[in-house]
Regions:
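Structural signature of hydrophobic alpha-helical transmembrane segments
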Residues: 1-14, 50, 56-72, 121-136, ...
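C-terminal ends of transmembrane helices
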Residues: 16-28, 73-92, 138-153, 199-212, ...
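Cytoplasmic-side transmembrane-helix entry/capping segments in multi-pass membrane proteins
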Residues: 30-40, 65-66, 86-99, 152-165, ...
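Transmembrane alpha-helix boundary signature
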Residues: 47-66, 78-87, 104-119, 143, ...
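Transmembrane helix-loop junctions at the membrane interface of multipass transporters and ion channels
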Residues: 55-56, 109-117, 177-187, 209, ...
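Structured cytosolic domains appended to multi-pass membrane proteins
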Residues: 284-399
Length: 399
């Protein structure tokens, strides 16, 4: 039976890999999502079968497990069916918070079951607990920010408190192992989980709305890391593989988005922008050119090739349907229209693609920034919608 369960895990992992591969292609993304979800369902089923045959477990406990699975499915499906496309970032943040919360609870439960863990198990347990707690509370703050219920908060005490908490997270396991603090494992575990929750809150609080795509990606990767650590603790190959997939993909995506913004990850986390590298003390007066609806309409009427560059402002204003109307009008006059997408456009990774897809904009006319940078001179007109930050020439040098 163990061999069958492990073989089923292998099939589930293969489903994860194929699903991730398909997600990189717009035409196969939907199938990729279904394949990955099928792999997860298969992994859950294999775990239940292994649990039923591997240990003596009461019918009541099995029933509770099935009730929890069904309840989670029904709640998740209702939330997904009810949410609007424009609210998808909030939903992703909420679901990610649930993953982090699960990792935190696993650490607390493990401290109750094993009151004398080995040093390695203790390190894994507390690392997963702290990362999961920070991911949970940080994702909740991100959810509130995306919903417009939480404003940015920048203060010197936040930076100092975060540094102190990091020192506590490093020192606590060492002090416990060398008997320099009371050997109350369960109590210390709960205290660390509370401090992890506090760290997650102050981690996200200073970060501005335009940087939320990076934050969401980073929080997703943290949840993946917490899951992988829990998998090592419980000797679960499927948890390890799933956590590594999520963690690695999240880290790579985070770094790519930071590179596209010409900012370091530390600058994003700190909510800081460096000052412009222009000459100090010199001022240049530039006359701002304004335009009118009539002038823009005239330029559009005579343009043969138009670029629409959407950004964070379009996502906030939910103007994707108006863009689609403009696109249809231009295409009726045989004007070629392309949407040029910056890696961090929108409110989460890939959010701009989702918004435009909701407005029935075909993927074929979506172009990535790097693919068209050298061809911008071929466009007769570029319409920038809430994306001044990504087209500003100073973005090439300022951080």
């Amino acid at each position: 039976m163990i061999a069958l369960v492990n073989f089923t895990y292998l099939i589930a992992m293969l489903g994860f890999v194929i699903g991730l591969k398909f997600l990189s292609s717009p035409s196969r993304a939907k199938n990729g999502n279904h394949i990955a979800a099928g792999g997860m369902a298969l992994a859950v089923l294999a775990t239940l079968v292994g649990l039923f045959y591997g240990v003596e477990i009461s019918v009541v406990k099995i029933s509770l497990i099935f009730i929890a699975i069904i309840a989670g499915y029904l709640v998740g499906k209702r939330m997904s069916d009810k949410v609007e496309m424009t609210e998808m970032p909030q939903l992703i943040s909420f679901f990610n918070a649930m993953g982090g919360g699960c990792a935190m609870l696993l650490g607390i439960i493990e401290s109750r079951l094993d009151d004398a863990p080995s040093t390695s198990n203790l390190s894994l347990m507390w690392a997963g607990l702290i990362i999961g707690a920070a991911s949970f509370s940080g994702s909740i703050v991100a959810y509130r920010k995306l919903s417009g219920k939480q404003k940015d908060k920048k203060a010197a005490w936040i930076m100092w408190l975060s540094r102190i908490l990091l020192l506590v997270f490093i020192a606590a396991p060492l002090l416990y192992v060398y008997d320099l603090i009371p050997q109350e494992l369960e109590l210390i575990t709960i205290l660390l989980s509370i401090l992890g929750l506090v760290y997650g809150i102050i981690f996200v609080l200073p970060i501005g709305g335009a940087d939320m795509p990076v934050v969401i990606s980073l929080l997703n990767s943290l949840t993946g890391v917490a899951t992988a650590l829990a998998g090592i603790l419980y000797d679960s190959s499927i948890m390890i593989a799933g956590g590594i997939f999520v963690g690695a993909a999240g880290v790579l995506l985070t770094l790519l988005m930071c590179q596209a913004m010409n900012r370091s990850l530390l600058a994003v986390i700190g909510g800081k922008f460096k000052a412009s590298k222009g000459p100090v003390g010199e001022e240049e007066e530039i006359e701002i050119k304004t335009t009118s609806f009539g002038e823009v309409a005239t330029k559009l009427a005579f343009a043969n090739k138009v670029a629409i560059i959407p950004g964070y402002g379009l996502a906030v204003a939910q103007a994707q349907h108006l863009c689609k109307q403009l696109q249809s009008l231009l295409e009726s006059k045989e004007t070629e229209v392309h949407y040029i997408i910056h890696p961090v456009a929108g409110r989460m990774p890939g959010h701009m693609n989702v918004l435009l897809a909701e407005a029935d904009v075909h993927y074929d006319i979506l172009k990535e920034m790097d693919a068209v940078n050298d061809e911008m001179s071929s466009y007769d007109l570029a319409i920038i919608i809430g994306a001044n930050d990504v087209v500003n020439p100073a973005a090439e040098t300022d951080e």
